[in-house]
Amino acid sequence: MTDVTIPTERGPMPAHLATPAGPGPWPGVVVIHDALGMSRDIRAQADWLAGEGFLAVAPDLFHGSRRSTCLFSLFRGWVPRGDLDAARNWLADRRDCTGRIGVIGFCMGGGFALAVASDHDFAAASVNYGGLTKEVERALPRACPIVGSFGTKDRWPGVREVPDRLEPILTAANIDHDIERYPNVGHGFMNDHDPGDLSIVDRTIAKVVAARYDEPATRDARARIAAFFRRHLGDAPPASDGPGAAT
């Protein structure tokens, strides 16, 4: 694992790169953080994907701006499409990448993953408790294959209904998908944040939306995501020795 910098139209974008052990090339995955930004948790998400045989990069989408400024822009419909395209292209241009790239996102990042599932050259998308805007919904008939994971106890506004909106559209468009609703888990169940990463406001919001890490649901969701990515990104046998150091 190592820190890298990806050139974008907004300037250099810091990112965490996790490389599988053993010889490449490997399929790639762009890992999109939640509203907390870059953290130990999102690095760990990239690392487990590398352990499954995927070259994973987690870009800092808040680069060059305050987190509060980016979150304010989010409520006005901000989607960092240029940064995500830059991360995808950066992976695709590497000699240790096969050129088949997926995208995965959590919470805010799950909504971004849905947004770039259509018309952005990703081969598969993993959407984890992400929101769905009307604009993104209209583009879904052109989406890549989607694997989605949601909690039935999620209290984030609108998210619990996303699976019921996704499935009919993807089915009608004949797009391969795997949408799972996990019983008795809430928002953010795959994100195991350090307490020090959470402000008082973050902790309050987490309580309101029933956000809590759930190990059994996470284990099952990760297995489904890895299998779905292997099917659509190409061969990526699990790396028995875990992620290795990137160069």
Language model features by range: what are they?
Residues 61-65, 131, 185:
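Short beta-to-alpha linker loops that shape the active-site pocket of alpha/beta-hydrolase fold enzymes
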Residues 57-59, 127, 148:
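Hydrophobic residues in well-ordered beta-strands that form the structural core
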Residues 155-163:
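Conserved alpha/beta-hydrolase "acid-adjacent" motif
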Residues 176-247:
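C-terminal catalytic histidine-bearing segment of alpha/beta-hydrolase fold enzymes
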Residues 148-150, 182:
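Short beta-strand/loop motif that positions the catalytic acidic residue
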Residues 3-96, 193-212:
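Serine-hydrolase catalytic machinery in alpha/beta-hydrolase-like enzymes
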Residues 141-146, 174-176:
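Short, proline-enriched alpha-helix->beta-strand connector loops that line the catalytic pocket
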Residues 86-143:
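Primarily recognizes the serine-hydrolase "nucleophile elbow" in alpha/beta-hydrolase
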